[in-house]
Amino acid sequence: MDLTPREKDKLLIFTAGLVAERRLARGVKLNYPEAMAYISAALLEGARDGQTVAELMHYGTTLLSRDQVMEGIAEMIPEIQVEATFPDGTKLVTVHQPIA
């Protein structure tokens, strides 16, 4: 399998997102990379499913709460930016204060 660097990045985000999802299911609080991967993977999948940038910007704020991440993690992530592929091209999705 010959993947481009962008495809490798997406695969890494997706894999890390799955690890984070499994840890959440077990009740484990997420650390910084896990929280970033969890939200980023959900945004990439939402774009692939046809959601708009505005919908994803809102959706990104509903994925994790402070109770689901380690202490101090919410403050470490003031925003998340993901370059996602939509049906009409690639766009930057920015989610402000993703962990409420």
Swiss-Prot record:
The gene is ureA. GO terms for cellular component: cytoplasm. GO terms for biological process: urea catabolic process. This is Urease subunit gamma. Heterotrimer of UreA (gamma), UreB (beta) and UreC (alpha) subunits. Three heterotrimers associate to form the active enzyme. Pathway: Nitrogen metabolism; urea degradation; CO(2) and NH(3) from urea (urease route): step 1/1. Its EC number is 3.5.1.5. It comes from Pseudomonas savastanoi pv. phaseolicola (strain 1448A / Race 6) (Pseudomonas syringae pv. phaseolicola (strain 1448A / Race 6)). It is found in: Cytoplasm.
